[in-house]
């Protein structure tokens, strides 16, 4: 055998960990083994070498993960993904439970990539390994732009492939936990009826930050937003998730049923509390105080922290899946090995045994908040730093940005010097090790996480991921130059032109207002009160830092400023 062929075969057979190491052998492409090393070994790992942490791993002292596994050779033929062909798929892990016999206890709104790599994957593990019978998922999309998802899932019997990519190999697993799918533009009534049905115990949602219609300054529902105003006026079909939740809750109240638990899986601190406040406010503004009081008194809105990097799927991913695993999937989801979910144990009408699938169930909302703060400010804050400053400098992927020495040093120093001192201390959790784990995750070259995905919807991200740290450093009198440069990079990004003069699309629900303000002057965007309030605008040190950073970005460009501030 030629040496190059042997090396290729060896590379194809390298270690890959599946979603759960305890998965039955017939579901698993191969066995795995794990070993742990001290944190000293982590620190000695070259900065450009990616090491995949175990799934659900919260970095603790004295732990380091190295997986080993092999998989079958590439298939000779391909098959379309559907229920009929499941048993014939040889190179992927497939469901063995009877999907048609499982009740749909969960309705999930927003069947995007993150949901399919996170909640749906956890539920699939429960269905496969623990004989859970009442908790499959009915997926729901509300907006017309989600029609391609409907068109992809329906012919595949709502099956899809989760492609898990580590630096040392790739695995594929067919997820079967979504057993029905409803598209609201086709039948809004069917969606409301499904939510109101007695078999529905949880309505979960991944609708992004902007889908909550919350004023970032007052934390109140934006009742003057056209979508919210239309729903409150009774226009059909509803435009917002709260229009559907309210209609379904009103029916359950009239029928004498319990409320369903509203489970936010969005990347926001206090996501459960926000969901509760927005829904109760919506009901009150709809003129139904009785239902509003009933929801407030009897409903459940658990807070959660969710984490898994999930890039956008592209045509190359589909071709690779067919070539290497023999699966023709109209819309697979690509993700990393790492995943984590910290969930408040606050449910009104039962829940699946999530902890069996690796979810960290905690009794206290403050524990969720602590994990969430660490994750949002370190992971998402660093993503924002790399995304906006990287886009301006002409980078394409996150792993390219973090591999550049200047950007890498900037991110490390921002995390260690400006963010870490503000974070809570959780017993048994090392923030230093978490930062090290993040650098490894960011460096994974196989994910190809595109910057436009990271930059999407900055008006909902910067006020959450960057501004709270700036505000706290202002109070503490601490360093904030790097954080301020990230905010300035977002202001500069909103012009839609990079440092080389190339135009790009600013994908943000507030894009018109942001760009109008950007045209007024360097820091005019800071005047948008529902994003920034009044306090930041009145702090002289911050305003001067912001002006200096913006002037530097305009004059010298992002790369030069990152180097200067690193």
From Swiss-Prot:
- Entry-linked InterPro entries: 6-PGluconate_DH-like_C_sf, 6PGD_dom2, Mannitol_DH, Mannitol_DH/Oxidoreductase, Mannitol_DH_C, Mannitol_DH_N, NAD(P)-bd_dom_sf
Q: Which reaction does it catalyse?
A: D-mannitol + NAD(+) = D-fructose + NADH + H(+)
Q: Where does NAD(+) bind?
A: 106-117
Q: List its EC numbers.
A: 1.1.1.67
Alphabetic keyword roster? NAD, Oxidoreductase
Give the Pfam families listed for this entry: Mannitol_dh, Mannitol_dh_C
Q: GO molecular function of the protein, one example? A: mannitol 2-dehydrogenase activity
Q: Does the keyword NAD apply?
A: yes
The family note in this entry says: Belongs to the mannitol dehydrogenase family.
Assembly notes: Monomer.
Q: Describe the task this protein carries out.
A: Catalyzes the NAD(H)-dependent interconversion of D-fructose and D-mannitol in the mannitol metabolic pathway.
Q: What is this protein called?
A: Mannitol 2-dehydrogenase
Report the source organism: Pyrenophora tritici-repentis (strain Pt-1C-BFP)
């Amino acid at each position: 055998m030629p040496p190059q062929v042997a090396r290729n075969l060896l590379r194809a057979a390298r270690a890959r960990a599946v979603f759960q190491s305890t998965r039955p052998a017939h579901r698993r492409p191969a066995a795995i083994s794990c070993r742990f090393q001290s944190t000293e070994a982590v620190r000695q790992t070259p900065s450009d070498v990616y090491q995949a942490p175990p799934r659900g791993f919260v970095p603790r002292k004295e732990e380091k993960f190295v997986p080993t596994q092999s998989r079958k050779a590439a298939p000779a033929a391909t098959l379309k993904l559907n229920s009929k062909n499941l048993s014939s798929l040889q190179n992927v892990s497939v469901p063995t439970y009877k999907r048609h016999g499982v009740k749909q206890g969960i309705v999930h709104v927003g069947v995007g990539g993150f949901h399919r790599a996170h909640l749906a994957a956890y539920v699939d593990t429960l269905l496969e390994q623990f004989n859970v019978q009442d908790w499959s998922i009915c997926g729901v999309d509300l907006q017309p732009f989600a029609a391609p998802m409907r068109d992809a899932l329906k012919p595949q019997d709502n099956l899809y492939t989760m492609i898990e990519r580590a630096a040392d190999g790739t695995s594929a697993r067919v997820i079967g936990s979504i057993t029905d799918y409803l598209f609201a533009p086709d039948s809004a009534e069917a969606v409301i009826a499904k939510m109101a049905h007695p078999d529905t115990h949880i309505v979960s949602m991944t609708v992004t930050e902007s889908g909550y219609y919350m004023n970032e300054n007052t934390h109140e529902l934006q009742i003057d937003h056209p979508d919210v105003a239309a729903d409150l006026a009774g226009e059909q079909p509803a435009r917002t998730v709260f229009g559907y939740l309210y209609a379904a809750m009103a029916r359950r109240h009239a029928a004498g049923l319990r409320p369903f638990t509203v489970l936010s899986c969005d990347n926001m601190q206090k996501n459960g509390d926000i969901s509760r406040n927005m829904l109760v406010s919506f009901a009150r503004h709809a003129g139904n105080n009785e239902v509003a009081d009933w929801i407030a008194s009897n409903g459940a809105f658990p807070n959660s922290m969710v984490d898994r990097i999930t890039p956008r799927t592209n045509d190359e991913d589909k071709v690779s899946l067919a070539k290497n695993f023999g699966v023709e999937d109209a819309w697979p989801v690509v993700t990393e090995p790492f995943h984590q979910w910290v969930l408040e144990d606050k449910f009104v009408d039962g829940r699946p045994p999530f902890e069996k699938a690796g979810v960290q169930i905690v009794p206290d909302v403050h524990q969720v908040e602590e994990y969430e703060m660490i994750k949002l400010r370190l992971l998402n804050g660093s993503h924002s730093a790399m995304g906006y400053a990287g886009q301006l400098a002409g980078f394409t992927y996150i792993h390219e940005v973090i591999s550049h020495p200047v950007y890498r040093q900037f991110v490390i120093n921002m995390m260690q010097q400006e963010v870490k001192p503000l974070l809570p201390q959780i017993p048994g959790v090392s923030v230093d090790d978490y930062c090290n784990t993040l650098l490894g995750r960011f460096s994974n070259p196989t994910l190809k996480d595109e910057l436009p995905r990271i930059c999407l919807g900055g008006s909902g991200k910067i006020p959450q991921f960057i501004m709270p740290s700036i505000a706290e450093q202002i109070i503490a009198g601490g360093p904030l130059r790097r954080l301020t440069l990230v905010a300035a990079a977002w202001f500069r990004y909103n012009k839609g032109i990079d440092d080389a003069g190339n135009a790009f699309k600013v994908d943000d629900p507030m894009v018109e207002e942001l760009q109008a303000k950007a045209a007024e002057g360097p820091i005019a965007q800071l005047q948008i009160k529902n994003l920034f309030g009044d306090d930041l605008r009145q702090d002289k040190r911050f305003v001067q830092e912001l002006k200096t950073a913006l002037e530097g970005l305009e004059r010298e460009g992002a790369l030069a400023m990152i180097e200067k501030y690193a």
